[in-house]
């Protein structure tokens, strides 16, 4: 069967930049699905996207479906012919329905019954006949939240469609897609090459468009932007900040990228750089430049869609546009400094945190009380912790945060520095919200750690205290994410404290606001402990490792983490699988037999294998116990791994359930001693493989 290269392009008005890549990928997936369902083989489907077009190149696709044979089942052979071998009325009716003669009949075996059938040859449909509907279905299935219809069209799409190209090699496939007749004419850059571009062959698409100032390949266009941005940054000894989502959006805004470096007045560098970066990235789609120390430089890079003969005009135009935005940020910053942070608490008394839990000032005072209590655990200075807690939410009333909500905490840090607060206090204001997401950095200061922990605990315990715990997909206070943050703050700062102790401290700050302390405590502790799985699964830890540790129900997150790391390491040892299986066998034996308490009686050890295992246990126990006391669980399990050989020998050569009651009881005690050594770390019997 012959193979062809197909090109499909849908030309539109400018597509939504934040959706362009998603639309391209979805079109590719849906088209591949349609081709597969139609039984059309192909080598690959390449997808392209630019602001005014979505396109596909289908390589080496079949010219048509393969011919097939369809079976139509008739009556059983026994009922199809009479005693003389002539067709019965049942068979005649079947033949009439199919429009066939006796000579065209076949038979097949259906279980124990032989039946008559008609095998009809079905010729496969051509690519030309199938492809238009495959593409239209793919377009209909694109993830478009809101479709629009142009005045001249009955069909809907994310933006009005202007043209359609559908080529099979050098031939146009006759089709109407999105109410537009397909052809071989596309269009170049809106300004550089607005005239029609006739495609002689499907393979000419990318090259023909590049001659018309359109880079249709998204990845190539993006790589060009990255190269140009880096070159411009290198020229001023700086590094560009290039967030992935911003790069995707800028790539989706231009057909012919031309990066240009512009400047802004150095006086704006006195404004918190986070505010400047936010406004330039979010509002203007600029790439900001920083030096080796991470300090913002007075430059930005804009990506134009035009290769101008006078790029200075474009640069100056962007500088003129950005100046008012930077001036606004500067104004807010200067205005805020007229009112000290501490004096803003009055405004917090009018800002509701949660109807039943009070205002943001109520929350601040609770956090302050809790932070002082936590200081003995985190090692923070209690006075610093209290002051930082009382100032923590004050910047929420500032003009700067009102304009740039993502600067909450960060703005407070700047204002606290200006007011002369010490580093622990000022940095804690920005660090209180860390970590913001999975894998985010943690606070660097002890005071920041204390406030971050206190803030999350206050919210979690308070929300549980009023009976509004997360349910299903509803988690308005982001308590699931907050709980993982609490666990990380404890574990990564090596805080030796139990979850229940922390919850109790938070409950003390609430007093009578929370009516049922016992239920709140139990629910909050269970919720936090339930987040271990999400935390460790994000790190790639296997579920059975968690189950092995959870079987012991450690109270301290730090202790839990050490055990998880130990079991994770244990799984990599060559002895692990055999020891896990042996532990499972031991656990099953001991579960059925109650008489396993007490010490092993050495005189009742009669088999060499049980004597050897006892000797090994006697030797390893004084080595392992200090490691357990020091919570060096990894080393403890590594030492216990040496027991594999004597354990294997024991089960190979010793009958645990001996007829002699004393021997049986002694062997059960020996196994219990072995089991207890392992379960001092985790229940390794639950490990798989």
UniProtKB/Swiss-Prot annotation:
<dbReference type="InterPro" id="IPR008909">
    <property type="entry name" value="DALR_anticod-bd"/>
</dbReference>
<dbReference type="GO" id="GO:0006426">
    <property type="term" value="P:glycyl-tRNA aminoacylation"/>
</dbReference>
<dbReference type="InterPro" id="IPR006194">
    <property type="entry name" value="Gly-tRNA-synth_heterodimer"/>
</dbReference>
<dbReference type="GO" id="GO:0005524">
    <property type="term" value="F:ATP binding"/>
</dbReference>
<keyword id="KW-0030">Aminoacyl-tRNA synthetase</keyword>
<keyword id="KW-0547">Nucleotide-binding</keyword>
<dbReference type="Pfam" id="PF02092">
    <property type="entry name" value="tRNA_synt_2f"/>
</dbReference>
<dbReference type="GO" id="GO:0005829">
    <property type="term" value="C:cytosol"/>
</dbReference>
<comment type="subunit">
    <text>Tetramer of two alpha and two beta subunits.</text>
</comment>
<dbReference type="GO" id="GO:0004814">
    <property type="term" value="F:arginine-tRNA ligase activity"/>
</dbReference>
<keyword id="KW-0648">Protein biosynthesis</keyword>
<comment type="similarity">
    <text>Belongs to the class-II aminoacyl-tRNA synthetase family.</text>
</comment>
<dbReference type="GO" id="GO:0006420">
    <property type="term" value="P:arginyl-tRNA aminoacylation"/>
</dbReference>
<dbReference type="Pfam" id="PF05746">
    <property type="entry name" value="DALR_1"/>
</dbReference>
<dbReference type="InterPro" id="IPR015944">
    <property type="entry name" value="Gly-tRNA-synth_bsu"/>
</dbReference>
<protein>
    <recommendedName>
        <fullName>Glycine--tRNA ligase beta subunit</fullName>
        <ecNumber>6.1.1.14</ecNumber>
    </recommendedName>
</protein>
<keyword id="KW-0963">Cytoplasm</keyword>
<dbReference type="GO" id="GO:0004820">
    <property type="term" value="F:glycine-tRNA ligase activity"/>
</dbReference>
<keyword id="KW-0067">ATP-binding</keyword>
<keyword id="KW-0436">Ligase</keyword>
